[in-house]
A protein has these predicted regions:
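Residues forming the flavin
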Residues: 2-84, 122-470
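Dinucleotide-binding Rossmann-like beta1-alpha1 core, especially the glycine-rich loop
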Residues: 65-117
Length: 470
């Protein structure tokens, strides 16, 4: 058992494992630890508990709280090792496939639907061939779709299951990681000054906590690499335009390299018969999309994201993405919507022009405006070229009536230097999930929690259980 750090107060509360963050990664880490018989687990979450999030709805935090960003996500479980993160850097293909299958079985046990989208291999292969002929790559994957309402139900079941086995504290933001002797994790310090000791600490701060993790990594001299920052727009079209694709794949992951800049543009979070929604990132407003399991609109929406990896000396991709989002908020109040035809003609959209378009916006509070005043030229040129290419696969995407919402930004700022079990350079300190740059989706985030928990469980076996609270 690790010795208590010298600066921890006498009588400090102690646990075997502290998990920072109650998103999919943190929840699955806690679940796997309990399955392995590890006791003395404390799960800390900066945001509100699930019941409070559901009461507040979208008026509360979209990213912080029980369930993390997953609580208000579209609820797509991508059952592919090629989609949703970078876990292939830490696992062999066989290990990752086993983790994905294990995570899928766990989601099914807690209420995920049996229906699988994208399981018609012949139809998917046909779409792949069509995309390849048009210089695009379609990444095949099977999906389970929870729907936004299904996410809340499933997270509630996980919360109830863990409640008797894990100490759960929401509204408890962590300020710092405490180190002990030999550069090992010794606990955490909360923002209110409370110190809590632990033998193991798992960091699962999610997208909401990625900036905090970057600060802590700098303070602890942990080596990091910069992840790409994804910036783009959300596209909304009649559902019939994308139906031949979504009927086969539900969500099409399509990658295209532009001729002009050779930048990668990709489709992301395709929402058949869904709606565009506004995300509040602590007063910074961006866009996203949802589909419900039982409520359908006449439209399909998806993001087009341009991925850029910055080189030295620039190391502030989060600040860069935030700057672009703030610019959109400054010009439009919150989120801007523009008809593609208006954008190509170099004019702003007005309420009148939006109203006479053939696509009725599902995000009614979006402000008609001019996205060319927001996105840097290179990003905008890449997206317009991608729309032209995609129109050859799904005619109608490049219509003058297509709606564009901006901006959509995915903040994945850094990757910590991690071992194969996701342990950092600090002994017994693990980093998992989206906030650590390990994953970009529900399944791989959950898998990262399982991987770290299994490593800790192996170390705990045979040790004196000590005086760990339950």
């Amino acid at each position: 058992m690790a010795k208590q750090a010298a600066w921890l107060s006498e009588g400090t509360e102690r646990y075997r494992v502290i998990i920072v963050g109650a998103g999919p990664a943190g929840i699955f880490a806690a679940l796997e630890l309990t399955r392995a018989g590890v006791d003395g687990i404390l799960l800390l979450e900066k945001g509100p508990d699930l019941a409070d999030r559901q009461r507040l709805g979208r008026g509360g935090s979209m990213l912080a709280g029980w369930g993390g960003a997953g609580a208000y996500s579209d609820g797509k479980l991508a059952l592919s090792t090629e989609i949703g993160g970078f876990m292939d850097q830490y696992c062999t293909p066989g290990q990752l496939a086993e983790l994905v299958e294990y995570v899928d079985e766990t989601y099914r046990a807690f209420g995920a639907p049996a229906e699988l989208h994208g399981s018609d291999a012949e139809a998917v292969a046909r779409l792949q061939r069509q995309a390849a002929r048009l210089d695009m790559k379609l990444i095949p994957s099977r999906y389970r779709h929870l729907g936004t309402e299904g996410c809340g139900e499933l997270l509630g079941k996980l919360r109830a299951h863990l409640a008797g086995q894990v100490a759960i504290r929401c509204g408890s933001p962590v300020a710092q990681i405490i180190l002990g002797e030999g550069n090992s994790a010794a606990g955490v310090r909360l923002e209110d000054g409370t110190e809590i000791a632990a033998d193991y600490v798992i960091l699962a701060p999610g997208r909401e906590g990625s900036a905090w993790l970057a600060q802590e990594a700098k303070r602890l001299n942990l080596q990091t690499t910069i992840n790409p920052v994804d910036i783009g727009l959300r596209v909304e079209v009649p559902a019939s335009v994308m139906e031949e694709i979504t009927r086969v794949t539900y969500e099409a992951k399509i990658i295209y390299y532009t001729r002009r800049f050779e930048d990668m543009v990709r489709t992301f979070c395709m929402c058949p018969y869904g709606e565009v929604i506004r995300e509040d990132l602590g007063g910074l407003y961006t866009v996203n999309g949802h589909s419900y399991a039982h409520h359908k609109t006449a439209n399909t929406n998806f993001a087009l994201l341009v991925s850029k990896t910055f080189t030295e000396p620039f190391r502030e991709p989060i600040a860069y993405g935030q700057h672009i989002a703030r610019l959109a908020n400054m010009l439009g109040g919150e989120v801007i919507v523009q008809r593609l035809g208006d954008l190509r003609q170099g004019r702003r959209s007005t309420p009148t022009r939006i109203k006479r378009g053939l696509v009725e916006p599902t995000l009614r509070e979006a402000t008609p405006g001019d996205l060319s005043l927001v996105l840097p030229y290179r990003y905008l040129a890449n997206i317009l070229e991608m729309l032209e290419a995609l129109d050859r696969l799904a005619p109608g995407v490049n219509s003058i009536h297509t709606l564009l919402y901006g901006v959509e930004v995915k903040f994945y700022s850094l990757q910590l230097r991690l071992g194969p079990d996701l342990e950092t350079e600090v002994t017994n300190l693990f980093a998992i999930g989206d906030g650590a740059g390990v994953s970009r989706g529900l399944v791989q985030a959950s898998a990262s929690g399982v991987l770290a928990a299994r490593s800790i469980a192996t170390r705990v076996k045979g040790q004196d259980p000590g005086n760990h609270r339950r």
